[in-house]
């Protein structure tokens, strides 16, 4: 029983244990099943993912294969093109070598010709220099001879001028004295003529008085006592009927006291008595004066003309003032005629007492010899005084003329001294210009020789194939991307040049090369440069097309790589690196361009005045040396060739 009980208990324990194990197994199986289900789901998801990845990889591989096939085709095409280009380049190389050999031969022949011509020009220059020195010596000698002869002629001219001035002053003095004597003689003649007219009028008056007295019956038979007691008022003369001689002597005695004031009155107004006696003359001179009037008028006109000439020729104002105070004979004749008409009118009214008074006053015109002598002495003293005044005036005029002549001589000497100084200055400036011209020509010769030697050395260097190819590519790059760099390189070259050289070069460029006989082969080089400039745009277009093709290939590669994420990440990194490098290069190129533009602006901003000054110097040089253009033309050609060779060497150094 005990065993039965134990067995039952053990059986239950065993059953419970078994049940527990079954339950735990079931639970473990369920959990395992769930875990397996989750792993299965994960595996299915991974399988789907890998399936998708496999599909994408297959698609990418297909695209890669297609792109590879296209790349192989393009590579084959590029190989073919490269072969063709290589063949073309070989042909071009051969042709270029042939043309280079021809150019070398031409340049050598031209250099030999230019060397021969240079030697000829040197010999001509030496000959011209000798001729110039001889001409300068001759010019100096001729200048000395000219200055010597000029000084001799000048001294002789001044001496002759002084002699002629002295002779002229003497002649003027003699002419003036002769005219003064003529004027005085004419005055004396006029005085004598007026005295003669007065005497004639007195004779006519006496005749008239005689006739009137004869007509009066009371005076025909007068008593002797009455005849003795008859007196005439104002000293008038009795008629000739009574004791003619005694009465005439009495008349003369009565006339003499009134004669003292006569000469002074004759000096101041010689015709004053004629004015008073005009009444007595009016009746008689109606018959007598009329035939004399034409002669008197002629004499008066001649006298008036002579006086006008004398007045025009007289120098100084003192003589004019003195003559203005004295009445001229024309004025006296005019006054006499006016008063003659007035007195004739008075005579028509009748004035017997005036007739007697005028007759007595007319008698005062008779002068004694003593009074005439005194009058002549006074006239001589007056003439001496006038002659003294004339001499003093002539001496003053002579001194004034000598002073003016000395001033003129001083002015002429100063003018001649200024002219000589200007001539010396001009000769000095010409000598300096000639010396500068000689130095400049020597510098030109030296520069031309150096350029020619450098050109020969540069042409003698053999060029390699790769170097020629690199130079062509570099020339294309410069033609496409950097056109301003060449301009910048050329502009400093022009700026460093001498302005005189630029002026000569511009003067040479003004000459038409086609008209120049010395132009040997210049047109060939110009045509070659034009062909090269025309080929540069074509080469730049071809390079642009090749760059466009490369851009298209890069875009295709970018599209192909877009499908693969790993490759895409690698491509993104490479793209970032490439973009960074491109940005750095673009920044560098932009900075270079800015610096170039800034330099160009500075050159254009700094040197417009220099260019204008060069243009002005060029105009002055062209005006000053129009004949020197042909002489320097060949030298300028050599300089241009040397500049081209220097530019080529500079490009090689840059490459």
Curated annotation (Swiss-Prot):
The modification Phosphothreonine is found at residue 589. It is a single-pass type II membrane protein; Lipid-anchor. Residues 34-655 are lumenal. Residues 399-423, 433-442 have a biased composition (Low complexity). Phosphorylated by c-AMP-dependent kinases most probably in its lumenal part. A lipid is attached at residue 2 (N-myristoyl glycine). Its main location: Golgi. The modification Phosphoserine is found at residues 328, 540. It comes from the Eukaryota. GO terms for cellular component: endosome membrane; Golgi apparatus; Golgi cisterna membrane; Golgi membrane; membrane. Expressed by spermatozoa (at protein level). Residues 2-12 are cytoplasmic. The chain crosses the membrane at residues 13-33. Belongs to the GOLIM4 family. This is Golgi integral membrane protein 4. It comes from Mus musculus.
């Amino acid at each position: 029983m005990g065993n039965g009980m134990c067995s039952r208990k053990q059986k239950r324990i065993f059953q419970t244990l078994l049940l527990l194990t079954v339950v735990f197994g079931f639970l473990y199986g369920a959990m395992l099943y769930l875990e397996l289900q989750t792993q299965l789901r994960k595996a299915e998801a991974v399988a789907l993912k890998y399936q998708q990845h496999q599909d994408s990889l297959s698609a990418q591989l297909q695209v890669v294969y297609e792109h590879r096939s296209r790349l192989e085709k393009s590579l084959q095409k590029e190989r073919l093109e490269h072969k063709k280009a290589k063949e073309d380049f070989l042909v071009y190389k051969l042709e270029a070598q042939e043309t280079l050999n021809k150019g070398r031969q031409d340049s050598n022949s031209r250099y030999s010709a230019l060397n021969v011509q240079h030697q000829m020009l040197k010999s001509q220059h030496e000959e011209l220099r000798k001729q110039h020195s001889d001409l300068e010596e001759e010019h100096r000698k001729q200048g000395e001879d000219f200055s010597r002869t000029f000084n001799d002629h000048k001294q002789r001219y001044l001496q002759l001028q002084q002699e002629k001035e002295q002779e002229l002053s003497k002649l003027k003095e003699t002419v003036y004295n002769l005219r003064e004597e003529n004027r005085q003689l004419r005055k004396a003649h006029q005085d004598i003529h007026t005295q003669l007219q007065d005497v004639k009028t007195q004779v006519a008056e006496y005749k008239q008085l005689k006739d009137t007295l004869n007509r009066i019956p009371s005076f025909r038979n007068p008593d002797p006592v009455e005849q003795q007691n008859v007196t005439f008022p104002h000293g008038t003369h009795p008629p000739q009927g009574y004791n003619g001689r005694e009465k005439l002597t009495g008349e003369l005695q009565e006339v003499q006291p009134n004669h003292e004031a006569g000469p002074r009155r004759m000096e101041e107004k010689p015709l004053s008595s004629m004015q008073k006696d005009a009444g007595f003359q009016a009746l008689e001179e109606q018959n007598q004066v009329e035939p004399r009037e034409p002669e008197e008028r002629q004499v008066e006109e001649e006298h008036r003309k002579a006086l006008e000439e004398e007045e025009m020729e007289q120098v100084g104002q003192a003589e004019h003032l003195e003559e203005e105070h004295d009445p001229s004979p024309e004025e006296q004749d005019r006054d006499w005629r006016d008063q003659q008409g007035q007195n004739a009118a008075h005579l028509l009214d009748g004035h017997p007492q005036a007739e007697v008074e005028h007759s007595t006053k007319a008698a005062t015109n008779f002068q004694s010899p003593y009074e005439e002598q005194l009058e002549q002495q006074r006239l001589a003293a007056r003439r001496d005084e006038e002659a003294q005044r004339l001499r003093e005036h002539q001496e003053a005029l002579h001194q004034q003329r000598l002073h003016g002549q000395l001033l003129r001589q001083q002015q002429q000497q100063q003018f001649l001294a200024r002219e000589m100084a200007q001539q010396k200055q001009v000769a000095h400036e010409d000598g300096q210009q000639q010396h500068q011209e000689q130095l400049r020509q020597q510098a030109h010769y030296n520069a031309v020789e150096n350029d020619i030697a450098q050109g020969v050395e540069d042409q003698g260097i053999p060029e390699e194939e790769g170097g020629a190819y690199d130079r062509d590519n570099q020339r294309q790059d410069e033609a496409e991307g950097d056109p301003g760099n060449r301009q910048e390189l050329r502009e400093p070259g022009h700026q460093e040049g001498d302005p005189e050289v630029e002026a000569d070069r511009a003067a040479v460029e003004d000459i038409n090369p086609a008209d120049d006989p010395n132009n040997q082969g210049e047109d060939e080089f110009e045509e070659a440069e034009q062909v090269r400039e025309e080929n540069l745009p074509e080469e730049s277009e071809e390079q642009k097309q090749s760059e466009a093709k490369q851009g298209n290939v890069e875009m295709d590669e970018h599209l192909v790589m877009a499908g693969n994420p790993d490759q895409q990440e690698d491509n993104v990194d490479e793209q970032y690196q490439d973009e960074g490098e491109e940005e750095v290069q673009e920044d560098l190129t932009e900075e270079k361009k800015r610096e170039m533009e800034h330099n160009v602006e500075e050159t254009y901003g700094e040197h417009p005045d220099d260019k204008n000054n060069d243009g002005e110097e060029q105009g002055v040089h062209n005006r000053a040396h129009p004949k020197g253009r042909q002489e320097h033309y060949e030298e300028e050609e050599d300089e241009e060739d040397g500049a081209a060779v220097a530019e080529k060497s500079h490009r090689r150094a840059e490459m």
